[in-house]
């Protein structure tokens, strides 16, 4: 039986999204129990109204909620009984294999880092997410917004934890291909930090394939793509906006005249398949990667379907036990990175 902790009060709409999303998820997974944190009276009423299977839900009453615009340090210091903090505590205490929250990203990252700590050798956790491609291939992208300013060592650490996670989840595919997001594929391009990261990864034991431009990510050119949080977040929001724009443009075009409406009827099966593949809700649920525990961040503005998919991500991560398998591999890869860094410093000093 998999047990997940759910911050029921987090997100733009709180219980209106988390409860129906959790109910639908439980109905699809009889092997799951949920610990839902939040105001017990409100939670019980909402769960009963939604027809949730109460025999597989434990309610953990909390008295506080982290605001969506609340400063991370304020949440960490003043909201120790928040639904977010208590959900993460369930993972720390071994009562749940993963925690899911649609709450304030900064507060979630700060709280999770404080409660769970990071994997030894990893300075900062990163927001990581699996993105679709034009095939059935998926690519793990990180960092998507947690760290807007990174050193080359931190970017290299992201590459290590991303590569180790993908390898743990798909060992049959061999060493994951790691790409560094840049403005061009040549090793002379990019900021000083990116160029230094390139050299570190080039001399590491990772399967580093070099720089990758953002327009190649959705074509499955790499299994792991690494960027700082500023670039990664802009990249992610651009992809989400482009998908939304294209979906709307196709819909408007097919509704523009009678001939196009008839054509839409004929193309309906293909259009449904395309809509399903591009539905951003299916890819809701980002991993706070680098922590000693599983925490999944749901988009704060998602609906019940999107929240259900965030729970699906937590379920698959918990069931695969991928994160529990990566610490040894991370330690070995980080040791190789230190060697690469020493060689790089020697080369610079000899100039």
Swiss-Prot record:
Record's subcellular location: Cytoplasm
InterPro entries xref list: FA_synthesis (IPR003664), Phospholipid_synth_PlsX-like (IPR012281)
One GO cellular component term noted in the UniProt record for this chain: cytoplasm
Pathway(s) it belongs to: Lipid metabolism; phospholipid metabolism
Any single biological process term in GO: fatty acid biosynthetic process
Single annotated GO MF: phosphate:acyl-[acyl carrier protein] acyltransferase activity
Enzyme class at the top of the EC tree: transferase
Primary location class: cytoplasm
Catalytic activity of the protein: a fatty acyl-[ACP] + phosphate = an acyl phosphate + holo-[ACP]
Cysteine pairings via disulfide bonds: none
UniProt xrefs under Pfam families: FA_synthesis
Enzyme Commission number(s) from the entry: 2.3.1.274
Keyword entries, A-Z: Cytoplasm, Lipid biosynthesis, Lipid metabolism, Phospholipid biosynthesis, Phospholipid metabolism, Transferase
Signal peptide range in chain numbering: none
Subunit composition and interactions: Homodimer. Probably interacts with PlsY.
Function noted in UniProt: Catalyzes the reversible formation of acyl-phosphate (acyl-PO(4)) from acyl-[acyl-carrier-protein] (acyl-ACP). This enzyme utilizes acyl-ACP as fatty acyl donor, but not acyl-CoA.
PANTHER family, alphabetized: FATTY ACID/PHOSPHOLIPID SYNTHESIS PROTEIN PLSX, PHOSPHATE ACYLTRANSFERASE
UniProt family annotation: Belongs to the PlsX family.
Entry protein name: Phosphate acyltransferase
Protein's organism: Neisseria meningitidis serogroup B (strain ATCC BAA-335 / MC58)
Gene giving rise to this polypeptide: plsX
